[in-house]
Regions:
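Bacterial Sec-dependent N-terminal signal peptides
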Residues: 2-33, 40
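Residue-level hotspots at or immediately adjacent to binding/recognition sites across diverse folds
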Residues: 24-365
Length: 365
C-alpha cells in the first residue's frame, strides 16, 4: 500500500512538473543572444552567455542618434545631424560607412521628426514636418499623407510604419465637453479602416502598434482600465490601468503596460495569452510615498515595448520617479528614470538611469 501511494505521489509530481515546464508560452532560454541598445550617443551591448555589459561611445559628431536596427544581418544607425540625416553601418565597435540621406531633406526641408523601420530585408523612412507625413523606401520611392484629418478641430494623433512599409495613423478629435463622446479614426495607407471610442488620451502611453496586417490602438479607458482595439470594438482588461504595447508570440497576443496599486504606484505588467506577469519585483525598482508622513518616493514602472526573437519575448521596462507630483490636465507627472531589458520574465540588462532609444536582439551561433 505504501509503495502504491509512493508511486502515485511520484507520478503526480512528474505530471505536475511536466505541465509546469510546458505551460510557458515561450521557448526555453537555450540560445545565446546579443542585446544591443542605443541610448544617447552610446551603444550598450551584452551577450547573454557571459552577461558582461560593453559600452561604445559614438560621440556627437554624427548628430543625434535616432534609431538602431538590423538590415540584411548588419547593424544600422540612423541619426540627425546639422547637415541632414545620416544612415550608417555599425559593426559593433566602429562606424564602417557614413552616408548622408538627402531624400528626407529634399522632401521636407527641416523636418521635426524622422525615423526608420525595417523588416530585416528592407527599410522605410517615415518623416513629418507637421503638414504632411512622407514615407520613403531605401530606393527613394515616396508616398505622402496629410498630417491631420481636419485642421479646424483640435486633435491628438499617433503614427507608425510597419516592416512592410504600411503606414498607420490614429486621430482622436476632441468633439465636445464630454470626453466620452470623442472617438478615434484609424487609417492604413491613407484609407480609414475603423473608428473606435472609449479610449482616452494618456500622453505618455497611448500608442499604436502594427502587428502583421492588424493595427492595435492601446491605452486606457475613462474608468482608468487598460483597453486595446484592433477594430471598432475596444476590449477592456482591468488587470491593467494602461496598456502601452502589444506583440504576438507563438500565435498568442501579448500586452504590456502597468497596473496602479493601492499605494498609487504603477507596476510593470504584461499579459501573454491568458496569463499575467508582474515584473516589478524582478525589476527591483519599487517604492511608495507614505500617505501620512509624506516620507519616501514613488518609484513606478511600465512595460514600454516588445521584441520577439526565436519564440522568446524581450521586454523593455521603464523606471519612473514621481517628481513633485501634481495634476496637469488630469495626468500625474512622472519622470523617466532609466530602462531595463527582460528576457521573457527575467531581467537580463539594466542600464541604470539610461533611457533606451531603440534595441535589437541578435542570435549568436
Amino acid at each position: 500500500m505504501k509503495t502504491r501511494l509512493f508511486l502515485l505521489l511520484a507520478l503526480s509530481l512528474v505530471l505536475f512538473s511536466c505541465e509546469d515546464k510546458n505551460d510557458e508560452p515561450w521557448s526555453p532560454q537555450t540560445q545565446d543572444v546579443k542585446i544591443v541598445a542605443l541610448s544617447g550617443s552610446t551603444i550598450y551591448s551584452m551577450n547573454t552567455a557571459d552577461g558582461q555589459l560593453k559600452t561604445t561611445s559614438i560621440g556627437d559628431s554624427y548628430g543625434t542618434l535616432e534609431n538602431l536596427f538590423l538590415h540584411n544581418g548588419e547593424m544600422m544607425l540612423f541619426s540627425k545631424a546639422s547637415d541632414g540625416y545620416r544612415m550608417m553601418k555599425f559593426d559593433g565597435d566602429n562606424i564602417t560607412s557614413n552616408n548622408i540621406v538627402t531624400l528626407l531633406n529634399d522632401y521636407l526641408g527641416d523636418s521635426w521628426w524622422a525615423n526608420v523601420t525595417s523588416s530585416g530585408n528592407n527599410y522605410f523612412y517615415a518623416c513629418s514636418n507637421r503638414e504632411k507625413y512622407v514615407i520613403l523606401d531605401e530606393n527613394g520611392n515616396s508616398r505622402e499623407y496629410n498630417y491631420a484629418l481636419d485642421n479646424s478641430h483640435p486633435y491628438y494623433s499617433l503614427a507608425t510604419v510597419n516592416g512592410n512599409g504600411n503606414f498607420y495613423q490614429a486621430y482622436i478629435y476632441f468633439q465636445s465637453s464630454t470626453p466620452k463622446d470623442d472617438y478615434w479614426v484609424v487609417k492604413k495607407n491613407g484609407q480609414e479602416i475603423y473608428q473606435v471610442s472609449g479610449i482616452k488620451v494618456e500622453p505618455i502611453h497611448t500608442n499604436i502598434n502594427a502587428i502583421g496586417d492588424n493595427v492595435y490602438l492601446l491605452g486606457s479607458n475613462y474608468d482608468d482600465k487598460g483597453v486595446y482595439a484592433m477594430n471598432s470594438n475596444a476590449v477592456v482588461d482591468d488587470h491593467f490601468t494602461v496598456i502601452s504595447c502589444a506583440c504576438v508570440i507563438n500565435g498568442q497576443l501579448c500586452l504590456g503596460g502597468y497596473k496602479t496599486d493601492e499605494h498609487k504606484v504603477n507596476r510593470a505588467t504584461m499579459k501573454v495569452g491568458d496569463k499575467y506577469y508582474d515584473l516589478t519585483d524582478e525589476l527591483g525598482w519599487y517604492e511608495y510615498k507614505d500617505a501620512e508622513t509624506g516620507a519616501g518616493n514613488n518609484h513606478s514602472s511600465c512595460v514600454e515595448s516588445f521584441m520577439v526573437e526565436n519564440n522568446e519575448i524581450y521586454v523593455r521596462v521603464r523606471k519612473y520617479s514621481q517628481v513633485n507630483p501634481y495634476i496637469s490636465g488630469g495626468y500625474d507627472y512622472f519622470n523617466a528614470s532609466g530602462d531595463a531589458i527582460f528576457r521573457n520574465t527575467h531581467k537580463v540588462m539594466d542600464l541604470g538611469d539610461k533611457l533606451i532609444r531603440s534595441c535589437v536582439i541578435i542570435p549568436q551561433k
